[in-house]
């Protein structure tokens, strides 16, 4: 079976995780392991605890060959290994001649 057919055939899922405690971070890693995308929002946490949580999830996702992308100071996107995250740079607009 073609990998792309497999991905599209099963449907992709995005899980939004807004932990209030460090113990909730494991849910994010488990979701990525289940081939789901995770958006982790740590705004509701104290800064030190938020950093610890983000580091834990990023390490867990990296251990299963997933990817991480910072969206803003406290929001991250985590993707499973089968998906490649890429950046689309805006095209520069040339001034009129």
Regions found by a protein language model. Give the residues of each.
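Positively charged, small/polar-rich N-terminal and surface patches that mediate targeting and assembly
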Residues: 1-46, 51, 55-97
